[in-house]
Amino acid sequence: MLQQNPSSPLHAEQFIKSSNSTPTATPAPASATATAPIHTVLATPQRPSSPRQFFERLYGHLETRTHNSESGDIDVGTHAETPYQSDGGSASSPDISISDERVSLVSFPSYELHAPTPDYSAYGAIANATLPPALSFPAFSADPHINAGFSAFLARRRRKEGRQRRQRTTFSTEQTLRLEVEFHRNEYISRSRRFELAETLRLSETQIKIWFQNRRAKDKRIEKAQIDQHYRNFVVANGFMSTIMGQTSYATSAPATSSAAATAAAMLGSSYYAATPALLPSTLVNNARRADVNYVDIEAQHQQQQQHHHQVHPDQQQQQQQQQQRRSRFVPPPTLINSC
């Protein structure tokens, strides 16, 4: 039977040829036939190996196992033996290395707020568990200064919770009324008067002193709120008046043609409308202005006549009537424009 070296390709070729060869008889040398009997050596038949076994024998020495021993990394190698049964009955069990790379786990600091009790053993196990870096909380850092400050805060909170809280003083209606009367007499109570009130109302001097302090603060808050309200009302009134004054100035600066156009539009029928001042002829605009001025003068004179009617002489009344008639002759009537 031939022996092979798996590390050299030449022996591999010889191994392939020998595995595919048929069993033959090996003749003895001629010198041996004369003196010794003939011994026939038959080669043991071999089945062809599987490709897996073949390449493992050829390149198995090149495979190296790498173990990464970094801090925090866990390399779990599971070795499974997979025996391969060939047709010839020879069992081979190559060692196959399977590396399972896991996510590196970083220990997370746990904080014990209170002393652990036996009932919370499960919670303690959860607190000591490790978390991946993606789930880390930046607020809880491992800085000793932050931990010391947090511990001091918890200690102050425990002391504050353990301290008995002072109860709020509740005054009766009679006590409140008596104190209000005294406050309206004088906002700052003297020591002798405070002692008398404490004896009368069955309160301590400290309670009466604090009540007067709170009452003065309340008066200041009310006074400030009233001042703010007056200021807001003043600002609103000024803004309203400025708005009104702005509208009045705009109305007085508007041309007199707008009033004439409005009068003409009010007098129009269904088939007539008032033209804009830009489209009206200059003569019509001038006539409208003169009519406006004359109308204002007539109204003013009429009011003056009513006021001084008992002082005016009959001759003067006739003269005024004649002047009004002459003015009415020169004032043309408003002209209407037909759009059809």
Curated annotation (Swiss-Prot):
Any idea which residues the entry calls the DNA-binding region? 164-223
Please tell me where this protein is predominantly located: nucleus
This entry's Gene Ontology molecular function terms read:
DNA-binding transcription factor activity, RNA polymerase II-specific; RNA polymerase II transcription regulatory region sequence-specific DNA binding
Origin superkingdom: Eukaryota
One cellular component GO annotation, for this chain's record?
Answer: nucleus
Q: Which compartments does it reside in?
A: Nucleus
Sorted keywords for this record are:
Developmental protein, DNA-binding, Homeobox, Nucleus, Sensory transduction, Vision
Database matches in SMART domains: HOX
Question: Compositional bias of type Pro residues: which residue ranges?
Answer: 331-340
| Function (record text) | Required to establish the unique cell identity of photoreceptors R2 and R5 and consequently for ommatidial assembly in the developing eye imaginal disk. Repression of expression in R8 photoreceptor by senseless (sens) is an essential mechanism of R8 cell fate determination.
Q: What's the protein name?
A: Homeobox protein rough
Source organism of the structure: Drosophila virilis (Fruit fly)
List the lineage, top down.
Answer: Eukaryota, Metazoa, Ecdysozoa, Arthropoda, Hexapoda
